[in-house]
């Protein structure tokens, strides 16, 4: 399916040079992964989707349980993409493969997309000490933050709310501000945690819920000042802006 918006371009992702992409942070990770998959297929790429934590199961999608290499190859040939993961019957969720299996599967595809964090649909989070679970083979890390957290109390909008409250040095009932989002996105104790020397991008989701674009633009500009490439938009209507120059484009979540 062709799209008016190219998220790969807007997030400045060089998937030829950096083919293993880990996605961390708040709600919207899975939707972003599926959107990137769609774009990559349009470009003729073979894509493996996987997780190092858990990911919502989708029974109608091509799936190779346990990352079985023969099945992965078969589905890549047929569908151009495959979800390779374990499967938990009791939760209905995809579950993680081993690092060794990820390294093996990496050789079978052009691009691997990895959901490497959990947030239980909360728009923002500050990771605990065991989070995120970025695989060793990852080249790029994209952190996702939902702009619907702006102005909302930490207790209502943040996953790991106590950790987020402690990190921001605010009460649980304090609202999340633009400055808080910048801090969370760029701190090594926030979503920049364990990124190390990898390429880093920030995607601010759900801009469609904002009455005005200025808060999102301000966050992106502040991230740019900190040498962080960022874009805001909606996987619903694809209205996006990337630093350093604004781009407003309409399309489809």
Labelled PLM ranges:
Residues 39-85:
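N-terminal phosphate/diphosphate-binding loop that engages ATP/GTP or pyrophosphate donors
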Residues 222-240:
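Canonical P-loop GTPase G-domain recognition
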Residues 3-13:
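Pre-Walker A adenine-sensing motif
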Residues 91-98, 117-225:
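Conserved catalytic-core segment of NTP-binding enzymes
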Residues 23, 48-51, 83-86, 112-116, ...:
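General beta-strand structural signal in soluble alpha/beta enzymes
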Residues 241-253:
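Single conserved hydrophobic/aromatic residue that forms the stacking wall/gate
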Residues 13-40:
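Walker A (P-loop) phosphate-binding motif
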Residues 74-101, 110:
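Ligand-binding beta-strand-loop-alpha-helix segment within the catalytic cores
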């Amino acid at each position: 399916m062709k799209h008016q918006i190219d998220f790969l371009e807007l997030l400045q992702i060089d998937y030829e040079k950096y083919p293993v992409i880990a996605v961390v942070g708040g709600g919207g990770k899975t939707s972003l992964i599926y959107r990137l998959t769609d774009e990559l297929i349009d470009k003729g790429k073979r894509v493996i989707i996987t997780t190092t934590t858990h990911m919502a199961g989708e029974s109608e999608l091509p799936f190779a349980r346990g990352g079985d290499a023969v099945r992965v190859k078969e589905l890549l040939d047929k569908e151009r993409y495959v979800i390779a993961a374990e499967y938990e019957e009791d939760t209905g969720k995809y579950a993680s493969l081993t690092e060794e299996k990820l390294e093996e599967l990496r050789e079978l595809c052009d691009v691997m997309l990895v959901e490497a964090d959990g947030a239980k649909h909360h728009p923002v989070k500050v990771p605990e000490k065991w989070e995120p679970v970025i695989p060793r083979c990852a080249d790029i890390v994209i952190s996702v933050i939902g702009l619907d957290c702006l102005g909302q109390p930490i207790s209502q909008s943040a996953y790991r709310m106590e950790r987020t409250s402690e990190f921001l040095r605010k009460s649980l009932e304090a609202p999340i501000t633009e400055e808080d989002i910048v801090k969370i996105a760029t701190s090594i104790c926030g979503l920049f945690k364990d990124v190390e020397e990898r390429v880093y991008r920030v995607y601010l989701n759900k801009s469609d819920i904002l009455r005005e674009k200025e808060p999102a633009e301000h966050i992106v500009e502040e991230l740019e000042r900190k040498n962080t490439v960022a874009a805001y938009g909606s996987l619903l209507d694809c209205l996006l802006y990337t630093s350093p120059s604004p781009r407003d484009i309409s399309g489809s979540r």
